[in-house]
Amino acid sequence: MEFRGHDEPVDEMGVAYGRTPPSSSSSPAASASAGNGAGAAEVRYHECLRNHAAAMGGHVVDGCREFMPMPGDAADALKCAACGCHRSFHRKDDGQQQQQLRLLIPSPPTPRVPLLMPPPQPQPHPHPQHPYLHPPFPYHHTPSGSGGTTTESSSEERGPPSSSAAAAQGRRKRFRTKFTPEQKEQMLAFAERVGWRMQKQDEALVEQFCAQVGVRRQVFKVWMHNNKSSIGSSSGGGSRRQPQEQQSQQQQQQQ
């Protein structure tokens, strides 16, 4: 006898023998745990930033360079085994700082094509002026009331140093003064009267004579010093009169 229709197909049960149905709840949990583990591995705590001298107004750190969790329960694991400080005092590095730095770094500028410009023309350099090439100062001419030709005397006058002479080794330039024959005669006569010397008591008389002749006091003093040995010795030094008599003679000459 054959019995048909009593065999049940295996596929109708919905589950095949020897196969394990996939678990929908296990994969998200595994992926979440894997994600948390990867995130925890990226976070690192570096040197300790705790200020141990904050109460005194200073700044002192303990020198701990990296956080090491203390063995024990969860509360002890938040303390550093090296310095004993809480993990919050250590600098946290979650790996995002380097990524932010990469974003903040500007991109290198694009090179620009230089414009084809003509080469600049060389400019002529000014020739440096030598201090000795400056023209000398003109001769000092003294005014003369009677006129006549001027003769060069042996007296020398020290003029004010120019800027170029001061820059060139600080040398002073000496200038010769020219006198007329009338000026020389008057200076010779006055020098014989005062004895070829200038004394303090004759300063007013000397100033008056220099203003009358048109010669500066320093110039007359140098001239008298240069000609004292030659002219003064030949004339015997002259006879020196009193200042009152000299003033009276000068007043008479002016009248």
Curated annotation (Swiss-Prot):
Source organism of the structure: Oryza sativa subsp. japonica
Residues marked Required for DNA-binding (site): 224
Amino acid composition bias (Pro residues), ranges on this chain: 106-126
Record protein name field: Zinc-finger homeodomain protein 6
Annotated GO CC locations: nucleus
Gene Ontology BP, a term: regulation of DNA-templated transcription
Domain notes per entry: The homeodomain differs form the typical one by having namely 4 instead of 3 extra amino acids inserted in the loop between helix 1 and helix 2.
One of the record's GO molecular function terms: DNA-binding transcription factor activity
UniProt superkingdom: Eukaryota
Role this protein plays: Putative transcription factor.
Keyword Zinc-finger annotated: yes
